[in-house]
Amino acid sequence: MRNYNWQHQQLMSRQMQSTPLVICVLDKFASGGGLLRTYAGQDVSFALQVKYSFAGHLGEGGEDLRNWVESNGNFSCVLTGPTTLQADVVYQGAGTFVFFYKPVLAGKYLVSVRLGSGDVPGSPFESYVEPGATDTAACSASGLGLLCAEAGVEATFNIISRDHYKNQRTCGGDNYEVALTGPVCFNASITDCNNGRYIAKYNCIMCGDYYVNLRRDGVPITGSPFVLSVVAGKTHGPRNKFPKSS
């Protein structure tokens, strides 16, 4: 029995010096957004739990694990994509390391989680940051039809829905209204392109200066009202109503 205990202690000692297993817990620790998909401006957190290959449950030998991680260069997390972000790392005990970051630019990122100079299993991860909710103050309008037009000729301009961080929305559904006031008053028609872009169209038959009032859900976007000048169209001479002489 004494010999067995000695052998067991020797085995445990060798295992304590072996490489632990690193287990990624994706999204299950998320306080807001998830690691693989989230929204601009959302706080994201995810956890890694580390245990020795001989441990019966997560967190066994937590302080030893922490010391092992520190001796191997510690964990780090860097996101590369539309911009580069460095996540904060906090040790919460029992072999659990939590990563925190907040992306504000929408797009595709690669999330590289490293221990020292080497990636943990599964890293780098693909992460998609979607635009946040539409922010009326960040929406914009542009195009020649917002500045000038020719009487009797259809004119157009674009409306772009954006979130608080200026990311263009990737879907439609926003409620815009374009009202023109001047020598005559009328509304423009709006086409939803279902990608965050909207096309406003109108055909003004009377020359003059107009205010273009552009609202989303009743709230003016930045720059509204815009000043529009409608000029006379091309001159057309009278048609010849006299029969040709023989």
Residue ranges and their predicted role:
Residues 1-5, 41, 56, 93-97, ...:
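Short tyrosine-centred short linear motifs in exposed loops/low-complexity segments
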Residues 4, 71-75, 107-109, 172-176, ...:
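Short beta-strand/loop motifs in extracellular/secreted proteins, especially
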Residues 35, 86-89, 100, 146, ...:
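Beta-strand-rich interaction surfaces with strong enrichment in secreted/lumenal proteins
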Residues 50, 101-103, 159-161, 202-204:
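Hydrophobic beta-strand positions in extracellular immunoglobulin-like domains
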